[in-house]
Design a protein with these regions (language model features):
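Active-site and donor-binding regions of nucleotide-sugar-utilizing enzymes
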Residues: 23-170, 317-319
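Conserved catalytic-core segment of nucleotide-activated headgroup transferases in glycan assembly
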Residues: 215-224, 235-273, 277
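Donor nucleotide-activated moiety binding/catalytic core segment of transferases
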Residues: 276-323
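Short hydrophobic beta-strand segments
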Residues: 15-27, 49-51, 102-109, 228-244, ...
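N-terminal beta-strand-loop-alpha-helix module at the start
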Residues: 8-43, 234-239, 254-261
């Protein structure tokens, strides 16, 4: 009987089912970067199977031995029903499809579709974004209270029955989560009775070997040309995937952008797209340069990229920037959008300029 092999699509890496020792579950590239920095090079290349949501860009996931599932929000009624069926099917078949899940160590973003893979097994939680638990893990936060209500609701109980207990108790807020890997300190209530590991991305990067650093840069396709191109512009606009995530309509998003860009010289500003953001900025703002490679700001900072000013609606990425970089923070103009994006929950650890909306 032939041994089953998981290959990267670029054919450079492979791991047999028998050799899988760890499983990495990610929807976004911040926890993927964190995982690659936490593990040794041998583990990340030869003994890990990656399960990615479709939000992970193809040019990244094709370089790692992985399985990818369509996890973007279902828009039509038919798509929503189809998604429910495929999730139930995955819960029933996961152990026969992927027998290595029974013995592997799990490192995961623990919400949504792919949390089904965890079943009732213990796992370690990777951090979704900078300061994530400071936003969602506080008892008075919007997200914490929403999850609390969901866990007691009929919908939450049905989802827990269909998909597993984590469906209504993610972000580490369950008994299966044994450890939290964080990039900063937090006093979030979900940290109680768990093993806490705190290592900044910078400290993990500095501890990494030169060969591992090169491998990580190759995975994310970050080159010297990229950093030199970005450094030409003194003002960096950090976008957010609001249209992709169905938080806002395209026309409304363009209106917000127009007001923001009125404050700056188009020759001095560059749009640095969020890794999930596929919005066509060139179509509406042909005079402004765009950097659309799916690379997170934190990785750019690790390779000594710098700028004079960062501008954003409410991107948490600005909190990783050094004090010498000025920040213009616009926030969100409507209460509905604030609730959707958790803008109101953002906790700043540094000085910034709050820009008021005219609309």
């Amino acid at each position: 009987m032939n041994e089953k092999i998981i290959k990267s699509e670029n054919d450079e890496l492979s791991v047999s089912f028998q050799n899988v020792k760890s499983v990495c579950v990610c929807y976004s590239i911040y926890p993927l970067l964190q995982f690659l920095l936490l593990m040794d090079e041998n583990m990340i290349k030869k003994h890990t199977c990656y399960f990615f949501g479709s939000e992970i860009p193809y040019n990244i996931r094709c370089k790692l031995p992985c399985f990818c599932y369509e996890t973007r929000p279902a828009k039509t009624f038919f798509d929503k029903i189809k998604r429910i069926v495929t999730k139930i099917k995955l819960r029933i078949t996961k152990d026969s499809l992927y027998p290595f899940l029974k013995d592997a160590d799990f490192y995961a973003q623990d919400f949504g579709y792919l949390s089904i893979l965890l079943g009732n097994r213990p796992y370690s939680m990777l951090q979704e974004a900078p300061n994530h638990l400071n936003f969602v893990g506080q008892e008075d936060s919007v997200e914490f209270q929403r999850l609390k209500r969901k866990s007691k609701s009929l919908k939450g109980r049905i989802e827990s029955f269909l998909y597993g207990s984590i469906a209504a108790g993610y972000d580490g807020n369950n008994s299966q989560c044994k450890a939290l890997y964080l990039t900063e300190e937090t006093n979030a209530v979900v940290t109680q009775n768990k093993i806490i590991h705190v290592d900044s991305l910078k400290s993990l990067w500095e501890k990494s070997s030169e060969s591992k650093r090169k491998f990580i840069l190759s995975v994310f396709d970050l080159t010297d040309d990229d950093t030199e191109f970005l450094a030409k512009y003194p003002i960096l606009f950090l976008s957010q995937p609001w249209v992709n995530d169905c938080y806002i309509k395209e026309d409304d998003y363009v209106s917000l952008l127009k007001e923001v860009f009125e404050y700056y010289d188009p020759k001095e500003i560059i749009i640095k797209c969020h890794p999930r953001d596929t919005f066509e900025y060139e179509k509406y703002f042909p005079d402004i340069h765009v950097f659309s490679k799916p690379i997170n700001m934190q990785l750019l900072m690790l390779v000594a990229f710098n700028t004079k000013k960062a501008v954003t609606f409410s991107s948490s990425a600005v909190d990783c920037l050094p004090e010498n970089i000025e920040i213009d923070w616009f926030g969100t103009p409507t209460h509905k959008l604030q609730k959707q994006t958790d803008d109101m929950a953002f906790i700043f650890n540094r000085a910034y300029n709050k820009i008021n909306w005219k609309i």
